[in-house]
Amino acid sequence: MLLLVLLFVFISATNASDVGRRELEKHFDVGDSSLDSVGDVLLKLKKLAHQRAFGNREFGHDAEEDSKKPVAISVLQPTVAKDVSPYLFEGDIFLSKKQAINILKEVSGIESKSKPNVRGRRSFDASPESKWPTTAPIKYRFHESIDFYAVSNIIKAIRYWENVTCLEFENSPDVADNEDFIEFFQGQGCYSMIGRNGGRQGVSIGENCVKAGVIEHEIGHAIGMWHEQSRPDAQSYIKVESDFILPSYVSDFLQRDKDIDTLGLPYDLGSVMHYGSTAFSVDQSSKTLITRDPLYQSTIGQRETLSFLDIETINKAYCSDRCSGSNDCKNGGYPHPKQCDTCLCPNGLSGPKCEDFEPPRKAECGGKIVVKEEWQSIESPGFPDPGYDPDQKCNWVFEVAGKRIEFEFIEEFSFLCTSTCVDYVEMKISADLRPTGFRWCCFNIPKGSFVSELNIAVIIFRSQLTNDVGFKLQARATDLPARTTPAPVVITTTPVPTTIEGTDQWAEWGSWSQCSRSCGGCGIMSRVRVCRTKQCKGRRQEFSTCNLKACPIDKHCAKLLANDKICNGRVCTKASQALSGCLEPQCCPPFINVDGTCQSDSPLLNDFELAK
């Protein structure tokens, strides 16, 4: 039986790899032997990590089951294409043969035995040969498979990298094949190599990969950046929930010591290079990464744009010799490597020395506020009605002399609800204003008060996709000690992965995951258990409904009903029927609102347990 399962996995991987191999050979300077080596090393790495996590459980069976499920590293990034996945590390990295072997050696402990004192703190490739030269532009060209819309967005992403770093790129359609260059092509998904590897080096911008932050992410790989959560210090900021990872993908959550260099920069949970909270999830909703500080949970996985520390990573790696003299920039800013008399400022800050607020976008809002002992309030555009509009941004800088600043959310609170916030309010109250702050969205108002570490803080409002109510926040000067008031983190205890004799012996169920929705009945949560024997009957994972309280009344409902009154015809009648109940607390189908609680007797719920 084991032989048949392994044979199935081999045949499936072979069929997928035939298509994937042709794509990789066409757009990268790699041959059959290199591809075979990379594929073999990644398979060994997967088996090694699987054995460490699950003991003697059959890898082949898990790999077969996992191959049927979609995989993504962030909800804001497309799923990994199965044809190329056997050759990709961490979902979107095509390793060189040397890189793959080095990672396997490090993870298996071979290097640590021969070099026990070697250790680093890393997020940028440490190999000197992996850096592109700064004496000439990085050449690139577009393959004919790239459509005009993708070309336009790639050019915008390249220009943004150029605007904030010392790097220069040059479109060279006639670049010689023996030169080093990047080739953008429409492949199966979004992926890239790490750093400069020589010759033609592809960056796949596949279908649904054209969002600015996704393209910037893949270019980041091409110029030397690894994923943020691969740093050896990542466990101080995140916890990996192995119970909820697709078992054959646990190797994609390894922390490594020797491949890359952090250049002394702090960990950034808002990096565009960070996994999302449901990366490689068994059900695309259970969280595989839990932030140690739960206030950052909705920050990780963003694909809006480069974070300030993403930019500083490249500037430290490539541009540290561009500006001499002292750094007069304030609040974590530093001289722009192309204009040394200008400061690059952390998100939300601006001005000659980074002491002012960043100008607003498509709204009249923001400002620099001198905090007093009495409460002062700010609010998002249009709060609470008609609410904010898409693609707006506001920035406030709060300052006080000799005291700290206390913040508290008041009145109403509502944003587009996503696991990684797309529309959000962000709070930066730490002593270091460079890293991304806490980001909140959805419908639950943050409870309690928050106190800054120093006498300055930054609040950022950002909308990208929708209109909604937004937020209102009040602030005052205080002598209270710095604090946040996060809800406790629910840490899942991973069952011991020891394989024992016999059959059908399960470990205890793990803890329930967080609910995927805050109200309305359509949220789910799940938990898993580990088979202690080689085979077990029954379900490895079970699901439960959760948060059955009806959602609040939509603040835009009255506006929609008013618009509907001027509409006539059959289409408008259907719209009127759909809107007729929007002045009542809402439940998701198949639930109905019964005295404020969402209830249903639908057979669809037969597969769901009731969590206790």
From Swiss-Prot:
- Please state the Enzyme Commission number of this protein: 3.4.24.-
- Stretches assigned to the Peptidase M12A domain: 123-320
Which Cys-Cys disulfides exist here? 166-319, 190-209, 329-343, 345-354, 365-394, 515-546, 519-551, 531-536
Return the InterPro entries for the record: Astacin-like_dom, CUB_dom, EGF-like_dom, MetalloPept_cat_dom_sf, Metallopeptidase_nem, Peptidase_M12A, Peptidase_Metallo, Sperma_CUB_dom_sf
Single Gene Ontology BP term? proteolysis
EGF-like domain residues are 320-355
GO MF terms here are: metalloendopeptidase activity; zinc ion binding
Q: The CUB domain covers which part of the protein?
A: 365-478
Q: Which residues bear sugar attachments?
A: 15, 163
One GO CC term on file: extracellular region
- UniProt propeptide residues: 17-122
Q: What class of enzyme is it?
A: hydrolase
What are the catalytic residues?
Answer: 218
Q: Does the keyword RNA-binding apply?
A: no
In Swiss-Prot or TrEMBL terms, this protein is called Zinc metalloproteinase nas-36
Q: What organism, scientifically named, is this protein from?
A: Haemonchus contortus
